[in-house]
Amino acid sequence: MILLKEADGSYFAECTSTYSEEEKMLYDIINKYPYDFDLDRLQWKIPEACYKEIQSAIQSIPKPGSSLKLPLFPYQEDIVSFCLNKGRALIAAVCGLGKTPCLIAIYADAIKQKKITGSGLIVVKASLKVQWKKEVEKFTDLRAVILDTEKAKTSSISAKIRRTQKKIDSLLKEKSHEADVKIAELTAQIETLQEQATTLFRSQFENADLYIANYETLNDTAVRKELHRRKIQYMACDEIQYIKNDRAARSKSVCEFSDVKMRFGASATPIQKNPLDAYSIMKFLEPTLFPKKGQFEQRYIRYSGYGIIAGSKNEEELNNKLSNFMIVKTHEDADSCLPSVVPITRYCEMDPKQIRMTEQLLEEIKALKEEEQEILKKYTNPEQGKQNERVKIIDANIVARQTFAQELADSEMLLESSNSEMAHNYITGSKSAKLEMLIDLLEEILATGEKVCIFSKYKRMQDILTARIQEEAKHNPDFNTGIAYINGSLSAEQRYTESHTKFQDSNDYQILIMSDAGAEGISLGKAKYLIEYEPAESYSIQTQRRGRIERADSVHDTVFVYQLIAEKSYDEIALKVIAKKEKYDAAIIKGVS
């Protein structure tokens, strides 16, 4: 509601488009006083006492997102306000607008306003679980817990049960009193272990404000049963397009919770294939909107014959129905609020074997550095010490292991293709979580039709990325796009062909993969997204990388930089190096303490 005070001392109130609980409260105040409705102005003319009471009431209304540590942008406040008032809604916001803090704020505000009680659930892609946990910790003091399936959580106990059962099976072949006694003891042990497994599984649900589960985890019967038992009142699905097929297991698992009090979904591209995507999504968010699939198909789907979907119909009607439960935000809504470059960090977890291997590499590096220090102590001139043959060998071994640690974080295929025999000693046989996180991110970006530049310091990574993208293209048409490349082996003419003729000027190329050879001298004004597959070697290179899309000739008012980080990997050390150099730049160059 907008309040107006005219020069002649008269007071007016004007309604806004959002009819919320708060707005209803303000209308109730107006009804307490004598008023006139001005048909020309479409406003209420109210007495001064009414004006002051409404003014006081507006000031008492909590600002959307007030439960967070960090403020929201105005367009994010709109999202939070809409969702809190609706109770269930679809957030259709393009990449980079910050849907994550919105979903966190909705839960935190709902708890604060006593709209709900107890723990909430956020369902995400597997590659984003760690990222979500970090975001909850960044924006709130809430405790977020990543849920595991019953099998994953109790694997060690289950192994003990299997071993004990094998002993029982062996004893059953014996016909003796001693065997029967032993079987009884082992059976009791199994019962105890089963109780321990149940306790361990349920323990992850204790003392948590927000549960974070990927869609596959929600397919676990035990997880769903425990969530039902706890009667959660808040559930949000990030990348809700993952349930676009109502017959898929993940969709059925999500829709099992369509009775949760507050339900939300977020996506940059909620409808990816055809209007049936909307049917499946609303089956969770608001099942009464389209109660029967057959009626939905008849009303909104256009078929070409043989059951093949040719398109849609009655689109305006469908949009009007969805709009009651949907808030849409584009980059244009955010351009006046966001800085010119929006940096976003996404985290993933390495396989436990890779974490242990990284720890081994770091221990080896530490031992080598200690050995080097002992040698250098013998020299009064450090530069002379660096010429020592053993020191040169040690330095080479340190650099090699640092490289192997970084390659381990990126993809073990780098180690496998290495010419170094030593590199093969650090292969664990585990898949790259970071590579899958990249594919998930590309899926979001390519669906928008925007261009994206990917930086990796390794030229060999270009082949690995290309192979994975082409594999994804076999079942996802959004990945059927041309890929341009820049690396140190190209001439100036070839670089121009790749960066301009292909990537900048052709609609057939959405992806440009570059080594740090492309970090300077190339303008990528058409790219809206830049992904750093691993941290740069230095703050300077990082600045150069990001400068490719932060340019005066950019066709975008806002560009987005994603940095992919594997937790407990060499990435974290590389970030510390960059942060240290950034402090130097701030203090020495910019004069900022």
Put a short name on every predicted segment.
Residues I212-L218, R224-K231, A249-V260, P291-S418, ...:
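Inter-lobe coupling linker of SF2 helicases/translocases
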Residues E537-T543, E550-S593:
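A conserved SF2-helicase RecA2
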Residues M1-K69:
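Accessory DNA-engaging acidic/polar modules
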Residues V94, C102, Y107-K112, L121, ...:
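Conserved Helicase C-terminal RecA-like lobe
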Residues N219-A222, K273-P275, Q462-I464, Y496, ...:
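SF2 helicase motor core recognition
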Residues C102, T117-F139, K273-D277, K457-R460:
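Conserved Walker A/P-loop ATP-binding site and its immediately adjacent core
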Residues S60-A92:
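Conserved pre-motif I regulatory segment
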